[in-house]
């Protein structure tokens, strides 16, 4: 029993040393959240295709200025596995870590997008419409 405990202590100590030696080179580019309807107006597949096009266009055009993140790509596979409120909470948790938000698609009629915009306003994040990037 003691050898297992000693092994665990040794492992944690070595892990701590290796992490402290790592040279993390974090990007200074703003992290921008792509807000797009998922279940509103159209099928999830149609909305995934739409936001996929938006994401690839933005990354190809602005890869040197921004890092873009799409909650639909991160969490879309959880549709039907989480209730709406829990799914939205996960998206809002991600948005909390971002520097800005881009409102896309028919966001005005999407409850989720409007909640995301509400949080962005509350946090003082930069808010853009997709048209601002054209």
Positions of the model-derived regions?
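Conserved catalytic or regulatory cores that recognize and/or transform ribose-phosphate-containing ligands
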Residues: 1-134
């Amino acid at each position: 029993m003691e050898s297992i405990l000693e092994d665990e202590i040794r492992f944690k100590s070595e892990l701590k040393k290796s992490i402290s030696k790592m040279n993390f080179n974090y990007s200074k580019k703003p992290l921008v959240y792509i807000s797009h309807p998922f279940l509103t107006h159209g099928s999830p597949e149609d909305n995934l295709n739409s936001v996929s096009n938006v994401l690839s266009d933005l990354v190809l055009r602005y890869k040197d200025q921004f890092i873009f993140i799409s909650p639909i790509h991160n969490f879309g596979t959880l549709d039907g596995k989480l209730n709406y409120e829990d799914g939205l909470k996960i998206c809002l948790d991600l948005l909390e870590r971002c520097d800005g938000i881009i409102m896309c698609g028919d966001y005005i009629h999407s409850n989720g997008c409007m909640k995301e915009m509400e949080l962005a306003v509350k946090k003082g994040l930069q808010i853009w419409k997709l048209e601002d990037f054209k």
